[in-house]
From Swiss-Prot:
UniProt entry tagged with the keyword Protein biosynthesis: yes
Main location per the UniProt record: cytoplasm
Family recorded in the similarity comment: Belongs to the EF-Ts family.
Pfam families: EF_TS (PF00889)
Entry GO MF terms: translation elongation factor activity
Protein name: Elongation factor Ts
Gene behind the chain: tsf
Length: 293
């Protein structure tokens, strides 16, 4: 399989590895991105890549709660300048309020809904595009329902670059819920508990860690014990309750929440532009010059 500049670029962004290391990894794995990531990790060249870690597009993440329902939404713009525009910020807030009230099932359904009794949501966005002068788009949203004895946590970081919505069970402690949301914004866990990590993912991680240990020249009779220890570190990276609490590093999030008589039911974290690729003028040429060598 031919290794393209865009493939090298994607692997480089996902792993932080050097250009030629990325090219070699892709060549050795016949262009399989996931296997190339594992190859680099086994060689000790790259750390675990988080899912959807390419952040490039601009816009705002926004969180709003009313009663037992809350919404987290992302609206994209082309530039950071527009994301700071008051008219754009008003648009995002109005869209969030509308979506929370009408509760459409998808972005497609939302765009076709009447807005303020007249134009559709898409037409409302189009009129904003005409005024602001940039392409704007409702990228995604999620509406969450809680029970009466639960509490929502909301946190917006960097003026809307990151938004988090948390649901804390058996509690009315809004400060606790916000603190958990803030932790999620800062540390970016993938799961609440270890139980949510699939068996396939754990098996894949265990194999990568085993190859790492063997490549380090460790004796086979202690490799398994090392793997289990390192697997614990992996869970600390991806599972919220296993992580050191960002406001008190001596305490795990799980123990802290438990001390408050509460539970973490779920969280949703939006980082503006994650998974989207930004146009770059010269990078592709730089990569190709290396790939062709």
């Amino acid at each position: 399989m031919a290794i393209t500049a865009s493939m090298v670029k994607e692997l480089r962004e996902k792993t932080g590895a050097g250009m030629m290391d990325c090219k070699k990894a892709l060549t050795e794995t016949n262009g399989d991105m996931d296997k190339a990531i594992d190859y680099l990790r086994e060689k000790g060249i790259a750390k675990a890549a988080k899912k959807a870690d390419r952040v490039a597009a601009e816009g705002l993440a926004y969180v709003k709660a009313e009663g037992n329902h809350a919404i987290i939404v992302e609206v994209n713009s082309e530039t950071d300048f527009v994301a700071k525009n008051e008219n754009f910020q008003k648009l995002v807030a109005e869209l969030a309020s509308h979506l929370l009230e009408k509760r459409p099932a998808s972005v497609e359904e939302a765009l076709e809904q009447p807005f303020n009794g007249g134009e559709t949501v898409q037409e409302y966005i189009n009129s904003a595009i005409a005024k602001i002068g940039e392409k704007l788009s409702l990228r995604r949203f999620e509406i969450v329902e809680k029970e009466d004895g639960d509490v929502f946590g909301q946190y917006i970081h960097m003026g809307g670059r990151i938004g988090v919505l948390s649901v804390i069970g058996q509690s009315s402690d809004e400060e606790l819920a916000k603190d958990i949301a803030m932790h999620v914004a800062a540390i970016n866990p993938t799961y609440v508990t270890r139980d949510q990590v699939s068996e396939d993912e754990v098996a894949r991680e265990r194999e990568v860690l085993k190859q790492q240990a063997l490549n380090e020249g460790k004796p086979e009779n202690i490799v398994e014990k090392m793997v289990e220890g390192r697997l614990g570190k992996y869970f600390e990276q991806v599972c919220l309750l296993d992580q050191a609490f960002v406001k008190d590093g001596d305490q795990k999030v799980g123990k802290y929440v438990q001390s408050k008589g509460a539970t973490v039911k779920e969280f949703i974290r939006y980082e503006v532009g994650e998974g989207l690729e930004k146009r770059e003028d010269n990078f592709a040429e730089e990569v190709m010059s290396q790939v062709k060598k």
